[in-house]
C-alpha cells in the first residue's frame, strides 16, 4: 500500500503521513520498503493503520509530534529490533542471550535519555508558553500605557485649548476695559469743556453787566455835566445882560451931565470895562470845572 492510498485509509494528508514516517524511522521503527517508479517507497501494511491513527490523535491532542511520541512510548513499545532470517548473517558467538541483554540495556538507556530529552522539551515548551504569556502581558501593558499616554495627550490638548481661550477672553476683557476708559475720559473731557463754556458764558455776562453799569454811570455823569454847563451858561448870560443894562443906563445919564462929570463917567466906564473881564474869567471857570470832572470820570 503506497502513501497516497494509505493516507486515504487513515484520513490524513500525505504530508502528515510522511511526517509520522520520518519520526518513526528516527526512533528506530522499521517500516516495509518497496520500489515505485525507480525510487524507494514505503509499503504500508494493515497493521500500520491503527498505529498511524493513534499517532494522529495524540498529535491533535498535544499539538506536537515529539510529545505525542513520548506519550505513546510510555504506553507502547515502538522500537523494533531488526533480526534478519539469513543464516549467513547470524552471530557465531554462543553468547547470543548476553548480547541480547546488552542490547536491551542499551535500548533502556536510550529510552531514559529520550525521556530526559522529552522532559527538556517539555520544559522548553513550558518556557515558550510562559514567554508567550509574558509577551501577552507586555503587549497588554503597552496598550494600556499607549491609551494612558493618549488620554494624557488629549488632556494636555484640552488644557492648551482652555488656556488659549482664557488668553483670548483676557485680551477681549482688556480691550473692553480700554474702550470703557477711553469713553469715560471722553465724557469727562466733554463735561469739563461744557463747564468751561458755562464759566466763559458767565464771565461774558458779568463783563457785559459791568460794561452796562459803566455806560449808565457815564451817561449819568454826562447828564450832570451838561446840566452844570447849562446852568453856568444861563448865569453868565443873566449877569452879562444885567451889566449891559446898567451900562446903558449909565451912559444915558452921563449924556446930561457936564464935562466934569465925563471924567467920572470915563472912570466909571473903565470900571465897567473891567467888569466884563471878570465875567470872562467867571465863564472860563465852569469850563475848567467841566474838564476836571471828565478827568475824574476817566480816572474812575
From Swiss-Prot:
Residues 203-285 have a biased composition (Low complexity). The keyword Coiled coil applies. Residues 67-179 form a coiled coil. It comes from the Bacteria. The keyword Coiled coil applies. This is Uncharacterized protein SE_2353. Residues 203-300 are annotated as: Disordered. It comes from Staphylococcus epidermidis (strain ATCC 12228 / FDA PCI 1200). Keywords: Coiled coil.
